[in-house]
Amino acid sequence: MDIKLKDFEGPLDLLLHLVSQYKVDIYEVPIVEVIEQYLNYIETLQVMKLEVAGDYMLMASQLMLIKSRRLLPKVVEHIEEDLEQDLLEKIEEYSRFKAVSQALAKQHDQRAKWYSKPKQELIFEDAILQEDKTVMDLFLAFSNIMAAKRAVLKNNHTVIERDDYKIEDMMASIKQRLEKENVIRLSAIFEECQTLNEVISIFLASLELIKLHVVFVEQLSNFGAIILRKEKK
């Protein structure tokens, strides 16, 4: 199965994206939840046999250290707090840097309008799909579901993995199900899967149907269920 997915600009970009979903001050986010989501994302990339850059793995090891320190006795609480504080300061600094970069890019676009030479078009692979949800938003939500499914399948020793699931067949199956039910939760489909390969194939099929506007997606909250609809609301 050949899969290509645009990555974030770096581990801090991914962390900033995760933190921003909470809509609170950076220093008030539940850091353990953010760490879990980051690790779920990295593990899902590995399961899907996608390349993970070294800086992402380095950050993952640092996050696991912060998480493990939380399990230690309170006598080392100051060490834990120092690590978390350092991480949050880096995210905040990156957030300011990104805001400045975006402002400069906007100014550049405005200046380009004064020249007769057409400016070079920028192409963003992480395109907005529907309801302001991007490919990466769905992938991050999927990685959290994937983590839960891996935990279930890990205890099932009778499952035999197969790798002959066809995306086209999965797309047809989802469309057929929507003809009957009109609305389905993506997690409900995953719960019926017997292997991780089947889960991955269904996710990719869903993503393709969404991109083609054959089905429509919604997520009522940043951490809510992903809903597939036959018709747009």
UniProtKB/Swiss-Prot annotation:
Superkingdom of origin: Bacteria
UniProt family annotation: Belongs to the ScpA family.
Protein's job: Participates in chromosomal partition during cell division. May act via the formation of a condensin-like complex containing Smc and ScpB that pull DNA away from mid-cell into both cell halves.
Descriptive protein name: Segregation and condensation protein A
GO biological process: cell division; chromosome segregation; DNA replication
Keyword RNA-binding: no
Keywords, ordered alphabetically: Cell cycle, Cell division, Chromosome partition, Cytoplasm
Subunit-structure text: Component of a cohesin-like complex composed of ScpA, ScpB and the Smc homodimer, in which ScpA and ScpB bind to the head domain of Smc. The presence of the three proteins is required for the association of the complex with DNA.
UniProt GO cellular component terms: cytoplasm
Subcellular location as annotated: Cytoplasm
